[in-house]
A protein has these predicted regions:
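C-terminal scaffold of the Radical SAM
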Residues: 9, 14-16, 35-65, 73-345
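Local cysteine-cluster metal-coordination motifs and their immediate loop/turn environment
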Residues: 22-37
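N-terminal [4Fe-4S]-dependent radical SAM core
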Residues: 1-20, 69-72, 380, 386
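Beta-strand-connecting loop/turn residues
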Residues: 26, 204, 278, 368-370
Length: 390
């Protein structure tokens, strides 16, 4: 994506797909995290090599099931987790070589990796740049030690203190940070102090999202046992609604509820999820969507390596799913193209009728088949999306 002053209008794209790879190990399991991940301390994972072999095996099996993938082109690869920066760079390199040998790959292939602060270093970024990784996202969440302790996150003070210095001197230009707000015990001003510290560095991508309480996490058990409290919803709504204007002043485009980018620096991979493009999900706990079918892998690394059924798929249900993803976008998109491509006639009529009602209420603009939310829709978003699918 080139930097441009014109806003990108998202549209249906038919000849590409993305690859997501889940590396399930972390230094420590955070209390609020509901991704499949296991805390294993500072050392490497015992099964790292066999896990990478299983990734290749899974890709091959899924391609045998969907041979048409060979006619598409991979334009995004995303190493997520867990903490993929915990894995050896050479293993990512071999995996990328494998993909290049098996598939058509776009010339401007986006290759992203999530990095945790404890792994970040100038040397690591050099290594990544050498193997073609061209996008790095660091899960910071907060720089406040009290907040990190509340979240049960590993905190390496030296690394947290030097991370902006490292990122602003990165050989990889497309770098971003995740920050979280609404952490109990922290004030609104704590979040803004983190944000302004990071804004000064001018990184091209920021994900700013609220803490949520997910079932099955340590955090949810602690809330149930009255050891911790729920996320601060009032603070969250206040920050959520203030952010678009503030970020715009700093030159960022608000392209998804929680995501801001300098022009041309949007995450092409994450846009696939919101624009209903196909992707292979590889690794334990990963999900994929290919040729109108979804699948999910076992949330257990050894079970995944022993036996992952690669012939079990559920058909997608675009009449309801499309709204859940597409209408999270706050940048403009060609809504008529999307609904004509994915929905049956009666759902198309329902979508169009509802969108016109939203326009009358001043919640969105529509023109020449292009849809864009207005800020007024933000706090109502969940209900609005629900209203289009029921
Ligand atoms: S580091 Fe990330 S993936 Fe790992 S437990 Fe924490 S939030 Fe989850």
């Amino acid at each position: 994506m080139k930097e441009s002053t014109e806003e990108t209008v998202w549209q249906v794209r038919n000849s590409f797909f993305g690859v997501y790879v889940h590396f399930p190990y972390c230094f420590k399991k955070c209390d609020y995290c509901d991704f499949y991940s296991e805390g294993i301390g500072a050392g490497p994972a015992n099964d790292e090599l066999s896990l990478f072999k299983s990734y290749q095996k899974e890709v091959s099996e899924r391609v045998s099931h969907f041979p048409n993938l060979k006619h598409r082109t991979i334009d995004t690869v995303f190493f997520g987790g867990g903490t993929p920066s915990k894995a050896k760079t050479k293993n990512w390199y071999h995996f990328l070589e494998f993909l290049r040998s098996e598939f058509n790959v776009a010339r401007d292939l986006e290759i992203s990796i999530e990095v945790n602060p404890e792994d970040l270093s100038p040397q690591l970024l050099e290594e990544y740049a050498k193997i073609g990784i061209n996008r790095v996202n660091v899960g910071v969440q907060t720089r406040n030690p009290k907040g990190l302790a509340y979240l049960g996150r590993h905190y390496d003070k030296e690394k947290y203190d030097s991370l902006l210095q490292t990122l602003t001197h990165s050989p990889i230009q497309r770098v971003g940070i995740d920050l979280m707000y609404g952490i109990p015990g922290l004030q609104t001003s704590d979040f803004y102090s983190d944000l302004s510290y990071i804004l000064e560095a001018g990184l091209p991508h920021l994900s700013l999202y609220s803490l949520t309480l997910e079932k099955g996490t340590q955090y949810s058990r602690d809330v149930k046992d009255h050891k911790k409290t729920e996320p601060e919803e009032n603070i969250q709504s206040e920050i959520l609604t203030a952010l678009p204007e503030l970020m715009e002043k700093h030159g960022y485009r608000w392209y998804e509820v929680s995501n801001y980018a300098k022009p041309g620096f949007e995450s092409k991979h994450n846009l696939k999820y919101w624009t209903y493009e196909p992707y292979l999900g590889i690794g334990p706990g990963a999900h994929g969507m290919i040729e109108g079918h979804r699948y999910g892998n076992p949330r257990n690394a050894s079970l995944y390596q022993k036996k992952t059924p690669t012939n079990q798929y559920e058909p997608v249900t675009p009449n309801s799913e499309l709204a859940l993803t597409l209408f999270r976008l706050f940048s403009p998109f060609r809504y008529l193209e999307f609904i004509e491509m994915y929905l049956d006639k009666s759902s198309q009529a329902k979508y169009i009728e509802t969108i016109h009602l939203w326009e009358k209420r001043g919640l969105c603009s529509i023109s020449n088949g292009i849809f864009q939310w207005k800020k007024e829709a933000l706090l109502l978003l969940d209900d609005l999306i629900l209203s289009i699918i029921v």
